[in-house]
Regions:
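Conserved N-terminal structural module of periplasmic/extracytoplasmic solute-binding proteins
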Residues: 4, 9-193, 221-227, 234-237, ...
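Loop/turn elements at helix/coil->beta-strand transitions in domains of secreted/extracellular proteins
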Residues: 46-50, 76-81, 100-105, 120-121, ...
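Ligand-binding "clamshell"
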Residues: 116-127, 154, 303-329
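Helix-loop-helix "hinge/cap" segment bordering the ligand-binding cleft or interdomain interface
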Residues: 152-221, 237-284, 289, 293-296, ...
Length: 529
């Protein structure tokens, strides 16, 4: 449980249950064993409170004591004490809680699982899963690569599992197609063609910035950043032979930075991209400040809705992936599942009940509640599948230009709240109010001819404790330095003539050791299969 600084968040599970291996509480409250024999159908007959901490998201602010939190208590006997931390302070707050041994019971991981495990801030889950979590056990038995999401062969964090078909295509190039038509320009098919389009935008629309980015991470460091499309990688990746490499050491990363630097120097790329928040970026696209972006295309509808209020012809659309300077077209998709997302504190009261609760969240009942709400109120079953009720959708369309996130904010639904089991298409029903809407299905079919272009993001092999500790130390040396220097290359503060020196600096900080450890762990993993 967390210390007095967040005292309202602490678990009171100790008043009603006992940890594994301890004696029953002196107050005569029920033990874990008796709770396992609940007569009410709940996970526990005696109410238990667990704290859950995650970062805020501007798209979906949390509503206190929302409907799903109330329903969880009714169905399971577990009260969730939800703590939302400002996104800007999230990593700092979590590092402080970890350093002071004050972790919440459940939390959203903020950094690499290996780092948190090395600090002793995650509960080992294997034995608990084997004994108390059949739904979770089945996931690890059936989902490819999920067994890689371990440290020293043990499970320390739980995944977000997609429960329906993946219509997501990853980050894409998205552009004001109405302006292409206005200037009689073809849709660009290569990055060089896009550069010329952006130059035309700058010349003809001087009050706008041709290219806007949601901060520097989404521009140059994320697996789904435009760097991949430009033919490079920033992070660890596997080449065609299965060998792990660190992308930012490679010459093709320098070439990607050179393109970004050219766009920055000519005012085509927003010169304030480093300090641009997600909300400011969204506002910029919805107001016409930005005319192109490379990021998640599912935001397009909300942008277009606002744009059309002042310009009925305005329209952002996704376009096919662009070929790089070598004529190659490549992109990482959004993963079917996301590994190592949720953690449980090693100090959690009654870990058996805690893992049972997560197992319930992965169950049909839990998944439907956390994605769709209450049956008969927010959704109904149609041909065996959940569908939001038409009147619920229309109610929220009348309240907000971004109806899904507004509804999810009030009710406590979806991936931006607490969904270990995630229905990724749940929000699509809110996006089909007009034939002109850019729906998930529409976006999916834009890339019908590029399915082989969109590949899975790399999944690193499982590491031993010693490897994890060494990787943590190396990344501490590399991460902040890499971020600072890479942004200097983009902005021109550092010349790309010094890229080889930058690579040497990274190697001096342990980059080669990082690659070596990844390849040794991969060889060990492959030999064990």
């Amino acid at each position: 449980a967390m210390m007095a600084s967040l005292s309202s968040c602490g678990s009171d599970a100790g008043s009603s249950a006992v940890s594994s291996g301890s004696e029953p509480a002196s107050s005569g409250t029920e033990s874990s064993a008796s709770q396992a024999e609940s007569t009410s159908g709940k996970l526990t007959d005696t109410p238990v409170t667990y704290s859950y901490l995650r970062p805020e998201n501007a798209l979906q602010p949390y509503t206190d004591n929302c409907e799903t939190v109330q329903k969880i208590a009714e169905l399971t006997g577990i009260n969730l004490d939800v703590i939302i931390v400002p996104a800007s302070d999230w990593a700092t707050k979590m590092n402080t809680l970890m350093a002071t041994n004050s972790m919440p019971d459940f939390f959203y991981l903020w950094t690499d699982v290996k780092e948190i495990t090395s600090a002793g801030a995650l509960l080992a889950l294997d034995d608990l899963i084997d004994q108390y979590a059949p739904n979770i056990k089945e996931l690890y038995d059936t989902i490819p690569n999920l067994d890689k999401a371990t440290v020293n062969g043990q499970i320390y964090a739980l995944p977000t599992i997609r429960m329906d078909e993946n219509l997501e295509v990853g980050a894409t190039p998205n552009i004001r197609v109405d302006l292409l038509e206005e200037l009689n320009l073809d849709v660009p098919t290569t990055w060089d063609e896009l550069y010329n389009v952006l130059k035309a935008f700058k010349e003809n629309y001087p009050d706008s910035i041709p290219w806007g980015s949601r901060g520097e991470y989404n521009l140059i460091r994320s697996y789904t950043s435009c760097v991949t499309s430009l033919g490079a990688d920033y992070n660890l990746y596997q080449d065609d032979n299965g060998e792990w490499k660190l992308g930012r050491l490679e010459e093709n990363y320098k070439e990607a930075l050179a393109f970004l630097n050219k766009c920055y120097a000519e005012g085509l790329l927003d010169n304030e991209y480093i300090i641009t928040s997600a909300q400011d970026w969204k506002s910029g696209l919805a107001s016409g400040k930005y005319l192109f972006y490379y990021d998640n295309p599912t935001f397009i509808n909300s942008f277009n809705t606002t744009l059309k209020e002042t310009d009925p012809d305005a329209r952002i659309e996704p376009i096919p992936h662009l070929a790089n300077s070598k004529g190659e077209t490549r992109a990482y998709g959004f993963a079917n599942h996301e590994f190592n997302i949720f953690g449980i504190s090693p100090d959690v009261e009654n870990p058996e009940l805690a893992i049972k609760f997560f197992d319930w969240l992965y169950s049909g009942e839990g998944a439907l509640l956390m994605n769709y709400g209450v049956e008969g109120q927010e959704y109904e079953m149609v041909d065996g599948a959940p569908q939001f009720k038409a009147e619920f959708i229309e109610e929220w369309r009348g309240k907000s230009s971004d109806p899904y996130y507004a509804a999810a904010s009030e009710k406590g639904l979806g991936k931006l709240f607490f969904t270990p089991a995630w229905y990724s298409q749940a929000q699509n029903a809110f996006m089909t109010s007009s034939p002109d809407d850019v729906t998930a299905e529409y976006i999916y079919h834009v890339y019908d001819d590029q399915r082989d272009v969109i590949v899975d993001q790399p999944v690193q092999p499982p590491y031993t404790d010693e490897e994890a500790e060494e990787i943590q130390k190396i990344n501490q040396n590399l991460d902040d330095y890499s971020t600072t220097e890479v942004n200097k290359f983009v902005t021109g503060e550092r010349s790309l003539d010094e890229f080889d020196a930058f690579v040497s600096e990274l190697k001096a900080k342990g980059a080669d050791d990082l690659v070596r450890i990844a390849n040794e762990a991969e060889a060990r993993y492959q030999a064990s299969k």
